[in-house]
Structure formats: structure tokens, C-alpha cells
A protein has these predicted regions:
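Extracytoplasmic
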Residues: 1-75, 99
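Active-site-proximal, structured, solvent-exposed surfaces of multi-pass membrane proteins
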Residues: 44-186
Length: 186
């Protein structure tokens, strides 16, 4: 028989609640993942910016763990999933259709090489949940595009090309120097 994970979550979804680092530290490391399925971890600046979109996670929810609670949290994340998620050669795209403004979470590691647009306009990428990504979207239908460019790749390619040119000039100089010396083979 083939195993089927009934508690799957989509790559992109929204939350109803946020949790603080202080709250999360009160939960054992082994059980933090379950809390992060229930609420998004935001820092103080993010709470100031996006707290109006989410409710703070009540402290009693930190102890409400178990298989049934986990299954309910996963079902809630599936229900709040993006309408479509597609991997591309340079990143990924997602389509959303939420009734209200939302902070959309993606279970993709944050990296400075990512840039994002929402409906073609540049969007700030939030580093949430200790290293994953989220982006703000307004109510209604939206197209989100994340594009990845390796940081420093263009600079390193230019440096490498310059080094090849310098090496080529050096080789030409050596060849000409040897040819100009008396008694050298031609």
C-alpha cells in the first residue's frame, strides 16, 4: 500500500493568527512545528506592520497540541491555500483570491537572491518563521511572482571574464618577450 499524508499543507497559504518568539520559546523544540502550522512567527516590526491582518495567538493555544489539533491546523491551512502554485525555472508563481488583505506565507526558504512582485509591482519579501517567506497581498485576485537570481553571480562572472582577459594579455606578453630575445626559437 502507498502511504498518503492526509495532513498535507500547500506551498502557499495564509494564517489567522501570529505567534511571537517569546511565546514560541515556551514550547519544546520538538513541538514548535505544530504551533507554526497554527500561527505565523512574526517579529515586532512585522507585528506592527501586519498585526491588523492577524489575531495574536492566545497563550492557551500553545498547549492545545495533539493529533486532532494538528489535523485541524493542517485542514485550516489547506482551506487558506493559494488558488494556484507553479514552480518556474527562476522561482515560482502563485495566484490568490482572498476576500481581505492577507500576508501570504510560502514554505520556501528565505534568500536575499529572491525578489517578488504582486500584480507586476515590486513587493517586499518578509522573512518569517525563522527563515521562510511571506508577502503582503491586497484583497481580490492577485498574481505573485518570486524570481531567484544568485547573489553576486553577475559580479563574479565579470571578475572571471576580466581575469581571463588579463591572463590572455599576460600570455601574449610572455610569447612576444620570448620571440624578441636573441637566440629564441621562432
Amino acid at each position: 500500500a502507498l502511504y498518503e499524508n492526509e495532513n498535507w499543507v500547500p506551498m502557499g497559504f495564509t494564517y489567522d493568527c501570529y505567534v511571537t518568539a517569546d511565546q514560541l520559546e515556551r514550547v519544546s523544540e520538538e513541538e514548535r512545528a505544530q504551533i507554526l502550522c497554527r500561527a505565523i512567527l512574526l517579529d515586532d516590526d512585522q507585528i506592527s506592520a501586519f498585526g491588523s491582518l492577524l489575531e495574536p495567538l492566545p497563550d492557551e493555544e500553545l498547549t492545545n497540541r495533539g493529533e486532532d489539533a494538528y489535523a485541524a491546523d493542517c485542514a485550516a491551512r489547506r482551506a487558506a491555500g493559494v488558488a494556484a502554485f507553479t514552480a518556474t525555472d527562476t522561482g515560482f508563481t502563485a495566484k490568490t483570491a482572498y476576500d481581505a488583505d492577507e500576508l501570504v506565507f510560502f514554505s520556501v526558504p528565505y534568500d536575499d537572491g529572491f525578489s517578488a512582485t504582486v500584480n507586476g509591482e515590486p513587493a517586499a519579501i518578509e522573512k518569517v518563521d525563522d527563515g521562510l517567506m511571506a508577502v503582503y497581498v491586497p484583497a481580490g485576485e492577485n498574481e505573485i511572482e518570486f524570481t531567484y537570481h544568485t547573489p553576486g553571480l553577475k559580479v563574479s562572472a565579470c571578475v572571471s571574464a576580466a581575469a581571463i582577459v588579463v591572463y590572455g594579455v599576460y600570455l601574449l606578453w610572455i610569447i612576444r618577450k620570448r620571440k624578441s630575445q636573441p637566440g629564441s626559437k621562432r
